[in-house]
Amino acid sequence: MNILITGGTVFVSRFCAEYFVAKGHDVFVLNRNSSVQSSGVTLLNCDRHDFTALQNTLSGINFDAVIDVTAYTADDVEKLCLAINKRPSCYILISSSAVYPENALQPFGENTTVGVNKIWGDYGTNKIAAENKLLDYYPNAYILRPPYLYGQMNNLYREAFVFECAERNLPFYLPKSSTTRLHFFHIENLCHIIQTIIEKHPDSHILNVGNPASIHIKDWVALCYKVVNDNKPIFYDVDTTLHLQRSFFPFHDYQYELDVTAMMRILDKEKLIDMQTGLKLSYDWYKNNRNKVNSKPYLKYIEENFK
């Protein structure tokens, strides 16, 4: 099967590319060749925003499936849809749970009315526009709305930050009195869902994807410490009226949870990676790939303000 994956150089798109190569598919990655490419892929060297170049690059190539990871606007989607020669049997857009307004009833279901989310701003509204544009061209396309993705190849300084704190045997600083729960999904489980969609074409075309349940931030931090050295973190509360949360903690002060009932009906339960196992996989990757994570100055802020 010929599969086109937009991106292919970092985290979600790179993991997807390597996942489907390992499954024996012919994987084409569309990117500007600014990074070393994964083994086994066919590079389509192009800036997707340059429509003429995109047309020329895709000319003469037919795809059975498209996994669009790097579409952030309606224009991104439209250019790709117009440049594809022959309609693929399956087009999957990786959207985001940022399409749901923060004040909507939770857990967010696929039928929740999408709209502005003040936490995510333009990112969320642009994703809504991308979804709508795709459905204009491909009414039977699939749209996936994940929460926080984590796991191997995660270049964002989220679990990696907590791993680093655990390695240094540091206490952990949490927003004071926070009861926030976070919703996660392991990158390999995302690939399992994509594979299922390509192979089985389920009836549900817009899917929330995520773990069966969210997790309290303190429990999430404790699991990160556990997979590093089996230690239990010492927690300190931080008054967020005095210190901006994002100065010392890798998530916004925002709790949300997705209803993933529809996803659970099609996901092979035996393949579902639990949080501790997923964090262990992430840490094993991180130990040998620290330079691939975009670190933030959280530890510097902590050292200067909380010691």
Question: How should these model regions be labeled?
Answer:
Residues I3-K23:
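N-terminal Rossmann NAD(P)H-binding glycine-rich loop of SDR-like oxidoreductase domains
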Residues S34-Q37, T42-R87, V99-Y100:
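NAD(P)H-binding glycine-rich loop region in Rossmannoid oxidoreductase-like domains
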Residues K79-N126, L134-D136, Y142:
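Conserved Rossmann-fold NAD(P)-dependent oxidoreductase catalytic core, especially the SDR/UDP-sugar
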Residues E131-M153:
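Conserved beta-loop-beta element that borders a ligand/cofactor-binding pocket
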Residues F163-Y173, T180-I215, A222-Y225:
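Alpha-helical substrate-binding/gating segment
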Residues I197-Y254, V260, L299, F306:
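Mid/C-terminal beta-alpha module of Rossmann-like enzyme folds, strongest
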Residues L242-E270, K280, N289-N291:
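Conserved C-terminal active-site "lid" loop/helix of NAD(P)H-dependent oxidoreductases
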Residues M275-K307:
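Amphipathic terminal alpha-helices
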